[in-house]
Design a protein with these regions (language model features):
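Beta-sheet repeat architectures centered on beta-propellers
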Residues: 3, 10, 36-57, 63-202
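Active-site periphery "cap/insert" segments of enzyme catalytic domains
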Residues: 4-18
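Surface-exposed extracellular loop regions of Gram-negative outer-membrane beta-barrel proteins
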Residues: 15-40
Length: 202
C-alpha cells in the first residue's frame, strides 16, 4: 500500500483498505487467490473513524466531503461521488481530519458525523450532520451540542443504545428522554405551504 492506511473494513466478503490518498480492496477465498485491487487511486479517507457501513454501502469522509465507496468506484474522483454536496459548506474550514467521529443507526437508516473540535470550549456550539437515506437520495439535518470523544451503537435484549463518550469523562446516551442533558430542547416545526387555490397566497 503506497499511502498511510487509515481504516480497514469488511464489506460483502471483501476487505476494503482505506488510505490517505488511495482505496483498495482485497478479494479472494484462500491465500492462493487473494488479489489486491484498486478502488480508486485519486481519493482517500482522511479519518478512519468516519468509515461506516450505511444503507448497503460504505460511507467515508474524503477530502471533498462524505462519499460512498460504490459511487467512488463507479465514477472515480469526480464530484458526483460526493453525497454531501447539499451541506458541503458545513465541512469547509475544518482542516484537521482528526476532528471527526461518526456512528450509524441502522433502524433509522442514519449516518451521523460529529465535528469534534477538542479545542472548542463551548460544547453547545459544536455541530454535526445527520445523513438519512431516503430511496435513491440523501437528506440532511444538523446536530448541535454533541462533542464526542468516541461513539458506539448496539442492540441488547431488543433495546437500542446510541452512545457517545464526552471529553468530560461521562458516557451519554442519545435518543433517550425529553431533554438535552437537563436542558429544554428547542424545536421548530413548519408545515407545508398551503396554496389555497392560488400559489401567491400563503
Amino acid at each position: 500500500i503506497d499511502s498511510p492506511i487509515t481504516a480497514l473494513t469488511v464489506f460483502r466478503e471483501e476487505l476494503f483498505i482505506f488510505a490517505e490518498e488511495r482505496i483498495y480492496k482485497l478479494a479472494g477465498n484462500t491465500v492462493a487467490d487473494f488479489v489486491l485491487q484498486p478502488v480508486t487511486r485519486e481519493i482517500g479517507c482522511k479519518n478512519g473513524f468516519t468509515v461506516q457501513e450505511f444503507a448497503g454501502d460504505i460511507v467515508f469522509l474524503g477530502p471533498d466531503g462524505l462519499r460512498s465507496v460504490a459511487a467512488t468506484e463507479r465514477i472515480g474522483d469526480v464530484e458526483l461521488g460526493t453525497i454531501s454536496l447539499p451541506v458541503q459548506e458545513r465541512f469547509e474550514g475544518i482542516v484537521d481530519p482528526d476532528e471527526f467521529d461518526s456512528l450509524v443507526i441502522p433502524d433509522k437508516t442514519q449516518y451521523r458525523i460529529f465535528f469534534t473540535n477538542r479545542s472548542e470550549r463551548n460544547q453547545a456550539q459544536t455541530k454535526g450532520i445527520i445523513c438519512v437515506r431516503k430511496g435513491d437520495s440523501y437528506e440532511f439535518s444538523e446536530t448541535k451540542g454533541i462533542q464526542p470523544s468516541s461513539t458506539d451503537y448496539l442492540i441488547s435484549s431488543g433495546t437500542t443504545y446510541v452512545l457517545h463518550g464526552g471529553y468530560d469523562g461521562y458516557v451519554y446516551r442519545q435518543e433517550q428522554g425529553n431533554d438535552f442533558d437537563g436542558s429544554t430542547i428547542v424545536g421548530r416545526y413548519r408545515s407545508p405551504d398551503i396554496v389555497a387555490g392560488d400559489a401567491g397566497i400563503r
